[in-house]
Amino acid sequence: MGLEEKLPGGILLSTVEKVAGYVRKGSLWPATFGLACCAIEMMATAGPRFDISRFGMERFSATPRQADLMIVAGRVSQKMAPVLRQIYDQMAEPKWVLAMGVCASSGGMFNNYAVVQGVDHVVPVDIYLPGCPPRPEMLLHAILKLHDKIQQMPLGVNREEAIREAEQAAMALTPTIELKGLLR
């Protein structure tokens, strides 16, 4: 029994949000922010063995104004943080951020004054990808999880309110440098 038999008269019912989410998830243009060894794995993902282009990401954007996904790969220094925020602010809406690797997610093994202890203190992060460095398969899995998140994202006024609340919640978190963990 195929789809044609289940749909009366060939009519498919959906919402604009679901259709827009479906279309939007298949055409992400990433702006790479490769700062360390994770960038090498990100480049390998674009090669023929892993083929990131099957997810609609064959074009890596050279300018933030044409990108809608920022992949932060590696540690972010205190001096690089304002540049990262400026690039994020230049990206057009809708935009998403993927923190690739332990250094981008939490500062990694560089627990000192010069390294930002998690890029989420500079820009709101949508997907965290662990690993040192994460394998290309893990990056592809994170992209698929981001696709799911994009497809469920609301549109219009509801979307702007959801983004505002998420960004305020992310910026209000306790900085990881103040947390007492294994390295303290």
From Swiss-Prot:
Task: Name the UniProt key words of this record, in alphabetical order.
Answer: 4Fe-4S, Cell membrane, Iron, Iron-sulfur, Membrane, Metal-binding, NAD, Quinone, Translocase, Transport
Give the UniProt record's GO annotations in the biological process aspect.
aerobic respiration; electron transport coupled proton transport
Q: Which domain of life is it from?
A: Bacteria
**Which chemical reaction does it catalyze?**
a quinone + NADH + 5 H(+)(in) = a quinol + NAD(+) + 4 H(+)(out)
The record's comment on cofactor binding reads: Binds 1 [4Fe-4S] cluster.
The record's listing under InterPro entries reads: NADH_UbQ_OxRdtase-like_20kDa, NADH_UQ_OxRdtase_20Kd_su
Q: Which Gene3D superfamilies match?
A: 3.40.50.12280
PROSITE patterns reported for this sequence:
COMPLEX1_20K
This protein's membrane topology, according to the annotation, is: Peripheral membrane protein
Where does this protein chiefly localize?
membrane
What GO molecular function terms would the record report? 4 iron, 4 sulfur cluster binding; iron ion binding; NADH dehydrogenase (ubiquinone) activity; NADH:ubiquinone reductase (non-electrogenic) activity; quinone binding
Q: Top-level EC class, please? A: translocase
Gene Ontology CC entries for this record = plasma membrane; respiratory chain complex I
Q: Where in the cell is it found?
A: Cell membrane
Q: Which cofactor does it need?
A: [4Fe-4S] cluster
EC number(s) given by UniProt = 7.1.1.-
Binding positions ([4Fe-4S] cluster):
C37, C38, C103, C132
Assembly and binders: NDH-1 is composed of 14 different subunits. Subunits NuoB, C, D, E, F, and G constitute the peripheral sector of the complex.
| Matches recorded under PANTHER family | NADH DEHYDROGENASE, NADH DEHYDROGENASE [UBIQUINONE] IRON-SULFUR PROTEIN 7, MITOCHONDRIAL
Which protein family is it in? Answer: Belongs to the complex I 20 kDa subunit family.
Task: Report the function annotation for this chain.
Answer: NDH-1 shuttles electrons from NADH, via FMN and iron-sulfur (Fe-S) centers, to quinones in the respiratory chain. The immediate electron acceptor for the enzyme in this species is believed to be a menaquinone. Couples the redox reaction to proton translocation (for every two electrons transferred, four hydrogen ions are translocated across the cytoplasmic membrane), and thus conserves the redox energy in a proton gradient.
**Protein name per its UniProtKB record:** NADH-quinone oxidoreductase subunit B
Its source organism is Mycolicibacterium gilvum (strain PYR-GCK)
Encoding gene per record: nuoB
